[in-house]
Amino acid sequence: VFQSYELFPHMNILDNITLAPRKVQKRSRKEAEAEARELLARVNLSDKEKSYPRMLSGGQKQRVAIVRALAMHPELMLFDEVTAALDPEMVREVLDVIMELSEQGLTMLIVTHELSFARAVADRIVFMDEGRVVESGKPEEFFTAPKTERARTFLDNFRFVARSRKEEKSA
């Protein structure tokens, strides 16, 4: 699931979700649509199945992209900065869906700068810089006692930005 949604603009939401299960997995339209409707209900988008992507908010499009991927019954889901292109108000609804998937035991690889979310949902953190793995470990270890200078610098900068924003709001 990518940050740019990759929905087909000329197809309604139901058709966007059911295309791959019908064409790739050779599932019947009836079966694919029934599952798509169940998945849309899980992400609170039942009323959008006949809508086109241009009619949806960024958060809604991202949830449709997640549903489309889930309709293929993946063993592993890759989320590549799925909240990067969203307004702050829309980020929460997408992260809630991913959190629910985590609680259901779906294996996920999540590329994100949403550090508090990563800390809450991850079994393992892999910190990368310029395409290289700098550090890897359990979330609590990474966030409380990073092993590398690069990870410490990154976290210190993140904490500084978070404190600055908090101070601006209280002023």
Segments (PLM) and residue ranges:
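C-terminal boundary and immediately downstream tail of ABC-type ATPase nucleotide-binding domains
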Residues: E140-A171
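ABC family nucleotide-binding domain
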Residues: F2-E130, V134-S136
